[in-house]
């Protein structure tokens, strides 16, 4: 009987990571043991430690989901000319990227979401690093678009800084995602998921201070949906 096919060190390392991701995503950092990962990867504990010195090191490696996604979005964001319309588009993109499947992400996106939520409950490192990458990716074009909206009179002055408004919108999108992360949503909004997202975006951009006139002029969901091709 032929033996198992030999694989090189990089392939073995990737196999371990692929085995670890769904375990961390489904059971959290604390609920997953090195033995669980070794068993799922079909390797011994000793061989696993040859590639990773600790469970924490494997957890850190899994952050590569955002390493794949964010640089691509950043390159395309930097091509956008800051304006009120782009400010609305960026926040629309937040909701669409968080609530709907990112093309080409496959299972990685769902695992990333579960890892993020588990991280908020226990080992905060994954969430902190992931959210920091998001902020670094979007901060410059968001800041310039806020300034453009203020200069155009499209946004009212609020006693809330831009960074907080940025995060408030993101947290609303994350909260909606959390309520729908299982196959059965936690709430029945009595509308389609697409309409729910569009209503949430409207609620969010109104909340950050955009005027009715600016929203009426620039908040065109069908156009914004088409503009998503600019990012992906």
Language-model regions: role of each:
Residues 5-6:
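Short Lys/Arg-rich basic patches
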Residues 15, 23-65:
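Helix-turn-helix
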Residues 30, 43, 125, 155-156:
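Conserved hydrophobic residue
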Residues 61, 74-111, 159-162, 166, ...:
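Hydrophobic alpha-helical connector segments
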Residues 93-100, 136-152, 156, 167-232:
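C-terminal peripheral helix-coil segments that are non-catalytic and often amphipathic
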């Amino acid at each position: 009987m032929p033996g198992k096919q030999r694989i090189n060190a990089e392939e073995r390392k990737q196999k371990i990571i692929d085995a670890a991701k769904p375990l961390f995503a489904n059971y959290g950092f604390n609920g997953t043991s090195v033995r669980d990962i070794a068993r799922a990867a079909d390797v011994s504990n000793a061989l696993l430690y040859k590639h990773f010195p600790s469970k924490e090191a494997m957890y850190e490696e899994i952050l590569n989901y955002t390493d794949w996604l964010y640089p691509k979005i950043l390159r395309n964001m930097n091509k956008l000319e800051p304006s009120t319309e782009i400010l609305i588009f960026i926040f629309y993109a937040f909701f669409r990227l968080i609530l709907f499947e990112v093309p080409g992400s496959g299972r990685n996106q769902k695992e990333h979401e579960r890892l993020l939520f588990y991280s908020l409950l226990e080992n905060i490192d994954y969430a902190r690093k992931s959210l920091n990458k998001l902020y670094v990716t979007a901060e410059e074009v968001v800041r310039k678009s806020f300034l453009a909206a203020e200069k155009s009179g499209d946004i009212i002055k609020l006693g809330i800084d831009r960074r907080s408004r940025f995060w408030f919108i993101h947290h609303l999108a994350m909260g909606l995602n959390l309520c729908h992360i299982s196959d059965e949503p936690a709430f029945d909004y009595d509308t389609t998921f697409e309409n729910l997202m569009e209503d949430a975006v409207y609620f969010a951009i109104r909340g950050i201070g955009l005027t009715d006139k600016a929203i009426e002029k620039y908040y065109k969901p069908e156009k914004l949906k088409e503009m998503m091709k600019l990012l992906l």
